[in-house]
Amino acid sequence: MEKLGMNEIREKFLSFFESKGHLRLPSFSLVPKNDKSLLLINSGMAPLKPYFTGKETPPSRRVTTCQRCIRTPDIERVGKTARHATFFEMLGNFSFGDYFKKEAIPWAWEFVAEVLKLPVDRLWVTIYEEDDEAFEIWNKIVGLPPERIVRMGKEDNFWEIGTGPCGPCSEIYFDRGEEKGCGKPDCGIGCDDCDRYVEFWNLVFTQFNKDEQGNYHRLPNPNIDTGMGLERIAAIMQGVDTIFDVDVIRGIRDFISDLAEVEYGKDADKDVSIRVITDHIRGITFMISDGILPSNEGRGYVLRRLLRRAARHGKLLGLNDAFLYKVVDSVVENYGGAYPEIIERKDYIKKIIKLEEERFKETVDQGLAILQDYINELKAQGKTVLEGAKAFKLYDTYGFPLDLTKEILQESGITIDEEGYKEELEKQRVRARSSRKEDNSLWEQDIYSTLGDISTKFVGYEVYESEAKVLAIVKDNEVVEQAEAGDDVSIILDVTPFYAESGGQVGDSGVIEEEDTLIKVNDCKKVGNKFIHIGTVERGLISVGDKVVAKIDVSKRKGAARNHTATHLLHKALKEVLGDHVNQSGSLVAYDRLRFDFSHYQAVSKEELKKIEERVNEKIYEQLPVVVEEKNYEDALKEGAVALFTEKYGDKVRVVKIDDYSMELCGGTHVKNTSEIGIFKIVSESAVGAGLRRIEALTGIEAIKYLNEQKEILDRVSETLKAQEKEVVSKIENLQQSLKDKEREIEGLKTKIASILAETLIDSAISVDGVKVIASRVEDYDMEALKTLGDILKDRLKSAAVILASSSKDKALFVGMATKDAVEKGVNMGAVIKETCSIAEGNGGGRAEMAQGTGKNISKVKEALEKAIEIVKGQLKA
């Protein structure tokens, strides 16, 4: 058996299936397209679901891919086992209603036995217990002995997700030899006690459709979906025990060892840390390359978790400063040949990682300060267990790993309520699941899938109206033969000039007419190859088979075309001004406005926005020709066309070229010359998520309307201030300065009043164990004023515990403060204010030195303050 490298195996697999008539597709982005059920692509099949369900037409009925994937459910086991990883590559061959078991099984055997040359006497297969067809093919056609074909139950060898397409599967195993076994007499396929038999290729035969009653119906055109883990087959081919010893991954592992000056294999704990970093940095690199940025939600949170976990393990190796960004060089060196995009984006990836590492270092320092407060509180209370909720807050808010919290607490003889921590963690998982709408619509049959193979020919690139035939009518989610005036309908035509919503561009509106019939079309969408014209029958009767004329609203189409070409100019200008790391992550192209979302790690400055706007307008005034061509996908990319990572492309693509300035793959409608755009005006720039920015802009007459509105506002402001336009800003600045001066005067007076009031309150203080205790209500003070008064009292009394209350907008306000020596004697204002606020039907808390809170019941303030004195007395006498 030849020791093939990962890159060699990947290429051999893809080339083999190309020789069997498969179209090789590049790996899809880790960001799922139009699939809310997935946070990240986690299998080779995941990005191909629309093809399996008929929602979209595949570029070929036979496809082969090597798909990069991310899975994190077992993240805590990564580094501790031989095979667990969050990032992996999945080799696959797929058939969309073309070939089936008779081809898939022999081809799989041919590849493993003849191309990879695995020893056939060490290969085993499993099949679904009722799949006699698969048994016959393995036994009679392939020639595998019956004793090496293992029948297994539904749990192991039948693939299904709820309702929809499903079917049996067959898995191929490699026997690593008796020395890897557990030695038990019944050791075999599926043994839980050893890793002797390794499954490396799963062939799924999607031949049934499961209905809601649990019945299985044979699909007229069954599919093939296979998946082989590249790292796993590489480990087998290279005769190594873990994926971290495989050639490509080992290169990254050794780079980390050298960086940390730690020899791998000498220290079990350090080896775990090296493996964790080796795994995580691969996923981190590809996630950022695919446009994901660290955040506190969704896939951004997954990325942040991987980054911080890897950084934490670096700390355990003595790498205290930012280092992960350096490891990207090794990832690019080892994976760049297969994924050239990470070579292009290397500098951007490193910049994002370094920024996040530096931010994490800051939050770790903040977390340490808060943890020390928790330790002081526990010692003051004589407790030795930290609440799980507090440990979780350190993890969730400050990215503080649980093991680091444990380690620091142990030094003070304190442990963590781990059950409480797990409860908080589970609550967060529940919140995350509920916030992400489960959407299995890709697997569900909709009304349009019942219409068979009818399709619509789109002619809207060439004409604004066309004759057509009505193929289907849908009303109230039911297929009908006809509709009449007043009915809301969805109509499918055989030919249409209506652009269907896609690529961010809104669908066309217009009318469908025949002699006495008029349908007002408000929108057009696409399901598979069917264009759905959504609207209302204004007059007459429309029936299936009718000959009609479809006309779009030309003025709206031209508006959308202006805005779509403008987004291409904007995309290019953003890259020129901000950097090549900018990638489009979403857009809206309407007839009256445009919106463009893009990856960038900070707000765009006013100066940068000005440059971007000027650059776009320069290209408009240069009157650049806009040319649309159809090209081969690979050729278009070689010529420099920009492809969006969230889109799927077929072999033939539509290329929109704006002279020599911009070239993008795009299916939208465009102007023929940039001069038709007229003018481009940015109206806003904002954040839409971590690392994602949004620009909204106007073109043409809409931009002129906007500028006129701004001029009217400026005129009104000028008139109000009694100043000329050029003097407006300085006049406002003078007014602002005057206002600040008055506010300072007011604050000074408040401080003087507080100082006078403090003398009165000091007279009311009681002394407990040498500490002056004050609990008093003052009227018309907000929270900040209460804190100021509390600081004055602390300064004057030197040794004090102060609880102050006031009211604001129908709620009670409480502030508690204690001097350092009072805290050392046992005073804990966090506990005092928490109980005080609860009496006033509210919530509060904080640190031992300072706490605050509110209450809903103002009438309970007196009772709450009396209770506060009791609590402080108890703390001091404890």
Curated annotation (Swiss-Prot):
Pfam families: DHHA1, tRNA-synt_2c, tRNA_SAD
Record-linked Gene3D superfamilies: 2.40.30.130, 3.10.310.40, 3.30.54.20, 6.10.250.550, Bira Bifunctional Protein, Domain 2, Threonyl-trna Synthetase, Chain A, domain 2
Catalytic activity reported: tRNA(Ala) + L-alanine + ATP = L-alanyl-tRNA(Ala) + AMP + diphosphate
EC identifiers of the protein: 6.1.1.7
Binding-site residues for Zn(2+), renumbered to this chain: H564, H568, C666, H670
Keyword Cytoplasm among UniProt keywords: yes
Keyword Zinc: yes
Top class in the EC scheme: ligase
Cellular compartments per GO CC: cytosol
GO biological process: alanyl-tRNA aminoacylation
Cofactor note: Binds 1 zinc ion per subunit.
Keyword vocabulary terms for this entry: Aminoacyl-tRNA synthetase, ATP-binding, Cytoplasm, Ligase, Metal-binding, Nucleotide-binding, Protein biosynthesis, RNA-binding, tRNA-binding, Zinc
Family: Belongs to the class-II aminoacyl-tRNA synthetase family.
Domain notes: Consists of three domains; the N-terminal catalytic domain, the editing domain and the C-terminal C-Ala domain. The editing domain removes incorrectly charged amino acids, while the C-Ala domain, along with tRNA(Ala), serves as a bridge to cooperatively bring together the editing and aminoacylation centers thus stimulating deacylation of misacylated tRNAs.
Protein name per the record: Alanine--tRNA ligase
Gene from which this protein is expressed: alaS
